[in-house]
Amino acid sequence: MMKKSATTSSACNGCPAHSGNKLRRMGTDAERYDFTIALAGNPNTGKSTVFNALTGLKQHTGNWPGKTVEKAEGAFSYAGSSYKIVDLPGTYSLLSTSEDEEIARDFILFGKPDVTLIVADATRLERNMNLILQILEITDRAVLCANLMDEAERNGVEIDLRGLSRRLGIPVVGASARSGEGISDLLSALSEVAQGIYRCTPHRLTSIGTEIDTRIDSLAESIRLFHPDTPNSRWLALRLTEGDRRVENILYADNEAPAEKLKKEVDEFRRNFGEDLHDQLSEALYSDAGKICQEVITQANKRGRTPLDIKIDRIVTSRKWGFPIMLLMLALVLWITIVGSNYPSQWLSDSLVGILHPLLKTRATGFLPDWLSGFLIDGVYLATAWVVSVMLPPMAIFFPLFTLLEDFGFLPRVAFNLDELFRRSGAHGKQALTMTMGFGCNAAAIINTRIIDSQRERLIAILTNNFSLCNGRWPTQILLATIFLTPAVPAYLRGVIGIGSVVAIALLGIAFMFFFSWVLSRTLLRGQVSTFNLELPPYRPPQFWQTIYKSIVDRTLVVLWRAVVFAAPAGALIWLTCNIQIGGVGIAEYLIDLLDGPGWLMGLNGVILLAYVLAIPANEIVIPTILMLTVLTTGIDGGTGAGVMFEADGTAETARLFEAGGWTMLTGINLMLFCLLHNPCSTTLFNIYKETGSRKWTLLAALIPLATGFVVTVAVAFVWRLVGG
C-alpha cells in the first residue's frame, strides 16, 4: 500500500462517482469530441502507459527515453463527455528547437488544448520539475500525474501531493498507470479542469527578478495589442527575447509598424539585460524547481535509486565489463533467435511453399492462362510466401527479446557505453539508440532518429543507419556462415564459429558506422557535437506476456506487412525478367551476363548482383532469388520453372546448388560482407526520403553503403586471389 502522503486516495474514492466504470475507452475514434487533452512530460515517465490506460490503445512503451517521436491520438469518454488525447513527444525542455520539443511546445501553445496532462516520474520528480514549470508558463489549464508511485514508495520517496498541488496551483494526482491505480482520480481531475469546475492558478517564475519580470509583462502587453488572437503572450515574450526563430516568424510576419515596434522593444530588452536571457531563465527555473521539491519531497534514499540498481550499473556500465556484457547479450539474443526460428521457418516454408503453392498451381490449371498463373502464383504469391516464412519466425523471436531488454532498462546502458565512441566520431550520443533499433529494422530506426535534437547530427544518423545489420539480413548471414565457415572447424566448434562470425559482421557494421559518422561530421555535415542528457532509468521487471503480445502486434506484424507490400511486386518483376525473352534468351540471363564482370571483381557473380537488384524491396527474398537464378543459368535440377523461387531441402542441398553455380569460400565471405554493405531496402529508402524531404540525402544514404561494399569486396577479392594464386 502507498503511504498516505504519497497518494490522493480518500474515503470517497470507492463510491460510484469516483470509480473507473465511467471510463469508456474509444481507441482512435476521435472524430467527435468535447475536449482536447495534450499529454506531455519527460521521456520515460510512463506517458504512453497513461495514454494506453485511457484510450485502450496499444501504443508501444519502453523503458528508455524517446519512445514517442510524433503525436499519437486516441479518445475516451468519461462522465458524459468525450475527450481526444494527444500524446506528445517526451522532452526535457521546451526552450530549445529540436523537432520533438517544437512539436510538444507548438501543440500546447497553438493547439489550445482544454487540458494539458503532465506525466512526471514520482521517483525523480526534481528532474521533471523543470519541464512542469515551463508548461505552466504556457498554459493556465493543467493536471499533474505523479506516475510510478509504487516505485517511489519502494525507493523510500514520499511526496506531499496536496502541498505540491498548492505550490503549483493545479490538481496533482498520484498514480501507477501500469497497474491502473489512480486512473479514476486522474479522470476526475481532468474532467473538472476541462469543464472549468476547477480553476487553475498556475505557478509563475518568481526567481527571474522583478525588473526583468516587469519588462517581460510590458512586452507581453504589446504582443496582445498587436496580435490579440495569439495565445499566452507572456511565453511568446520570453521566447522573443531569446531569439526563437519560429516565434519571430509568427510575430514578425510583416514589416509594418507593429512588427517594427516589437523588434525595437526586444532590442531594447537585450541591451538592458543581455543578449541571451536563456541562462537567467534556466537559473530561475532550477531555483523555483529546487524550492518546490525541497518543500514537498521526503527522500530516504538520497540517490533516488535502489542499491541493487547501483550495484548492477557498476558492472553493466563499467569500462571493464560493459562491452563484454553487451556483446554477450547480443550473441545470446542471436543464438536464441537462430535456434528458435529454425523449426517454425521450416514449417511455414513446407506449408506455404511446399503444400499451398503446388495446390494453387493445380487449381489454376485450366482456369487461368499459363502466363497469368505463373505471374500471380509463381511470382507474386511465391515471393510473398518466402518473405513470410523466412522473416516472420526470426522477427517473432527477435523483437520480443529486444522489447524485453527495453522494458528491463538494458538498452539505455548500451547507449551509455557507446556514447563516448559516438561523440568522438562527431555524432550525437542518441545515435546509439537508433543504431540499436536498426538491428531490428532500419526502416523503423530512421523514423526514430527524430529523438536527435540537431538536424545535422540527425542526418548523420540517417545516412549511416544501414550499417546496423537489420533483421531481414540475419538469415542470409547465418546461412552463409553455416555453409562456408563452420565446415572448416571441428563439429564441437561449429556453433561458436557460426555465431561468432555473424556477431563479427554486426560489429564490423558498427565500426563502419563510426567511421562514416566521423567522415561526414568533418566534410558534408561539419559542426559541433551536441550535448544531451542520457537518463538511465531504473531496472523494471518487464510485463512479460503483455510485452510479447505488443511486440508481435506492433512491431513484427507491422514490419512484416511493409515487407510483404514491397515483396509482392518484386516477385512479379522477378518472374517477368526470367520469362520474357529477347531472341530466345530471357532478360534475366542478359542481365546476369552484363553483371558477371563487376561481380567477378567483387568476388561474387552476376547472379548475386542481379538478385540484389531484383530483391531491393525486401532483403528476405535475396537467397530464394539467388537459388532460382542459379538453377536458371546452370540448368541443373531444381525449382519448378523459370522465375520460380524455391528453397533447397536443407543447407546441404543449398550448398550443392551454390557449388554448381561456381561458388567458393571467397564468394561466401564476400557475400556476407556485401549483405552488410549494400543499399538500404526500398522501405528504408522511402522512410529516409519522407524524413529528410530530400532526394540528395536519400541518394547519398543509398550510395554510401553500396560504394563501401564495392570497394571492400573488390579489395578482399584482390588480396584473396593474390595470396591464393
UniProtKB/Swiss-Prot annotation:
**What's this protein's function?**
Not involved in Fe(2+) uptake but is involved in manganese uptake. Could be GTP-driven.
Query: Which SUPFAM superfamilies does the UniProt entry name for this protein?
Result: P-loop containing nucleoside triphosphate hydrolases
Return the GO cellular component terms, semicolon-separated: plasma membrane
Predominant subcellular localization, coarse grouping: membrane
Indicate what this protein is called per its UniProt record.
Fe(2+) transporter FeoB homolog
Q: Where does GTP 3 bind?
A: 87-90
Q: Does the keyword Glycosyltransferase apply?
A: no
- Per UniProt, GTP binds at 147-150, 176-178
Membrane topology term reads: Multi-pass membrane protein
